[in-house]
UniProtKB/Swiss-Prot annotation:
Substrate binds at residues 30, 44, 56, 142. It is found in: Cytoplasm. It catalyses: diphosphate + H2O = 2 phosphate + H(+). GO terms for cellular component: cytoplasm. Belongs to the PPase family. Its cofactor is Mg(2+). It holds the Pfam family Pyrophosphatase. It comes from Ralstonia nicotianae (strain ATCC BAA-1114 / GMI1000) (Ralstonia solanacearum). Mg(2+) 2 binds at residue 71. One of its GO terms (biological process) is phosphate-containing compound metabolic process. This is Inorganic pyrophosphatase. The keyword Hydrolase applies.
Length: 175
């Protein structure tokens, strides 16, 4: 099924869909979903051997500054499976740039109805400094051994900035 058939969400930017490409703590393989067919393709093997610190995916029918859909890390009590759709709400974002342009990573949790374990989380501070440090370190280093690739982490952004990223991503997709 084409991911173009999956809506960006019920109440953008407060309640949005994320399609999971990489489960939390899975083997260091970067998967990319083909947006037309819905199939997952191996994009590359992560040379640093690092594991994604949270589930990683994208908001369908969005377009971010790097020309890809808006990226999202989804913090959950258990890893999710490749290709599943999970309704989320954002806590903030990691602002960064890479060789393709602006490449922000939203940090989100499932909507409260889906996960009582994360319902108390209202901003980035609620996921804990250790996980924030792991996320930042992962994205600073995961491309370190790949020729021609680089990442510059610019810091954290709050919910308002993350909401703007989502709204802009939906608008860019519709252009």
């Amino acid at each position: 099924m084409s991911f173009n058939n999956v809506s960006p969400g019920k109440d953008i930017p407060n309640d949005f869909n994320v399609i999971i490409e990489i489960p939390a703590q899975s083997d260091p393989v970067k998967y990319e979903a083909d947006k037309e067919t819905g199939l997952l393709h191996v994009d590359r093997f992560v040379g640093t051997g690092m594991r994604y610190p949270a589930n990683y995916g994208f908001i369908p029918q969005t377009l971010a500054g790097d020309g890809d859909p808006v990226d999202v890390l989804v913090v959950t009590p258990f890893p999710l499976v490749h290709g599943c759709v999970v309704r989320c709400r954002t806590l903030g974002m990691l602002k960064m740039t890479d060789e393709s342009g602006q490449d922000a990573k939203l940090v989100a949790v499932p909507v409260n109805k889906l996960s009582p374990a994360t319902a108390h989380m209202t901003d980035l501070s609620d996921i804990g400094q250790n996980l924030l440090d792991q996320i930042k370190h992962f994205f600073e280093q995961y491309k370190a051994l790949e020729p021609g690739k680089w990442v510059k982490v610019e810091g954290w952004g709050g919910i308002e900035e993350a909401h703007k990223e989502i709204v802009d991503g939906v608008a860019n997709y519709k252009k």
